[in-house]
Curated annotation (Swiss-Prot):
Gene name linked to the record: miaA
Catalysis performed (reactions): adenosine(37) in tRNA + dimethylallyl diphosphate = N(6)-dimethylallyladenosine(37) in tRNA + diphosphate
Enzyme class, UniProt record, top EC level: transferase
Pfam family, one: IPPT
Taxon lineage: Bacteria, Pseudomonadati, Chlamydiota, Chlamydiia, Chlamydiales
Superkingdom in the source lineage: Bacteria
Subunit structure comment from the entry: Monomer.
InterPro entries per record: Dimethylallyltransferase, IPT, P-loop_NTPase
UniProt keyword terms in alphabetical order: ATP-binding, Magnesium, Nucleotide-binding, Transferase, tRNA processing
HAMAP family per UniProt: IPP_trans (MF_00185)
Designated name of the protein: tRNA dimethylallyltransferase
Requisite cofactors: Mg(2+)
Chain's role: Catalyzes the transfer of a dimethylallyl group onto the adenine at position 37 in tRNAs that read codons beginning with uridine, leading to the formation of N6-(dimethylallyl)adenosine (i(6)A).
Classification via PANTHER family: TRNA DIMETHYLALLYLTRANSFERASE
Length: 342
């Protein structure tokens, strides 16, 4: 079974300017340039990316593990439909909230989107904060094939009839070494492991995949990481979380619960959703609202620290301080680099 078909939403250079390896320099002459743009949550990636796309005649590929899901709009700060109609976006709103979508699916769909964009002489701009997905794009997919929907549908029926524990026991028999590394309640990993075994005939524990930063073998990547001052970022996050609540984030969560978001452990554990799912499960007590709101803000702030740490490992991403600079100016700096080195 294949991953969902990519959709456009329309309704390696390592970051250094001089490469000391002549073989790499020669190889890069034949690579097409792709722009990578990341930054912590609340750093203004969306605004910069929209302006950048206009400057370089680009189209945007979302690198966000939750924006692939329809209905997860407010909590993921999804780009507006109006902006998506103006500038084509890919890998947004392509899955139902109960569907599993992983790094392998992302890799193949992002590559497909890049080829589509480049075939029309446009510039692919990968934008988002999911470090693991960026790693996958640069280094290749984790061991294993793309998702097989038919097989996953079969597993869903097994879960419905026999429970998740039945699948976990099955995994323990087929790959006890890997089964010991996950919990018996981790539906995503259990399903993915059985899927890999089914499609490849090999145990998950037999697959190897490096988490060391690597250059893209496919493209000449020019990467940027937006870096606002810590105090400013914390202020932005508080305002961002407050606006999400004013925009009816809790109502969005209620709707997603009705659509079965609990069936997707990744989506239901996403920041901005897990806190309010718990709040709703408790009966939405008014006295707990402020505490849950603060937890939402705190979890978001902690996540930005992890994002900074993750991206520091990747020399392809150059830090771009944002203090005192508008989105237009920041986009201009990236565009200038692209026209000089792309």
């Amino acid at each position: 079974m294949r991953a969902p078909e990519f959709q456009s939403n329309t309704t390696t250079s390592t970051g250094c300017d001089v490469c000391l390896d002549p073989q790499k320099s020669f190889a890069n002459l034949f690579k097409r340039t792709v722009i990578l743009l990341s930054g912590p949550t609340g750093s203004g990636k969306t605004d910069v990316s929209l302006r950048l796309a206009s400057m370089v005649d680009g189209e945007i590929i979302s690198v966000d593990s939750m924006q692939v899901y329809r209905g997860m709009d407010i909590g993921t700060a999804k780009v507006s439909l109006e902006d998506r109609q103006r500038i084509p976006h890919y890998l947004i709103d392509i899955c139902h909230v109960q569907e599993l979508f992983n790094a392998v699916d992302f890799y193949y769909q992002a590559m497909h989107a890049c080829q589509n964009i480049l075939s029309r002489n446009k510039v692919p701009i990968l934008v988002g904060g999911s470090g693991f997905y960026f790693h996958t794009f640069l280094s290749g997919p984790p061991g294993g094939p793309p998702a097989d929907r038919e097989f996953r549908d079969q597993l869903a029926l097994y879960i419905q009839d026999h429970g998740l524990s039945f699948l976990y026991e099955n995994l323990c028999q087929k790959d006890p070494e890997y089964a010991r590394t996950i919990t018996k309640n981790d539906k995503n990993k259990i399903v993915r492991a059985l899927e890999i075994i089914h499609l490849t005939g090999r145990k998950v524990s037999e697959h190897s995949w490096s988490m060391e930063p690597q250059e893209s073998r496919e493209y000449n990547c020019r990467g940027w990481f937006l870096s606002p001052p810590k105090e400013l970022l914390l202020d932005n996050i508080q305002l961002r979380c407050q606006k999400m609540l004013e925009d009816n984030l809790i109502g969005e969560v209620r709707g997603l619960l009705e659509q079965g978001i609990r069936e997707n452990s990744s989506a239901s554990k996403a920041i901005g959703y897990r806190e309010w799912i718990e709040f709703i499960d408790q009966g939405s007590p008014e006295e707990a609202y402020e505490a849950v709101k603060q937890k939402f803000i705190t979890n978001t702030c902690q996540y930005t620290k992890k994002q900074r740490t993750w991206f520091k490992r990747y020399p392809v991403f150059r830090e771009l301080p944002t203090l005192g600079l508008t989105a237009e100016t920041l986009a201009g700096k990236i565009a200038e680099d692209y026209f000089l080195h792309g």
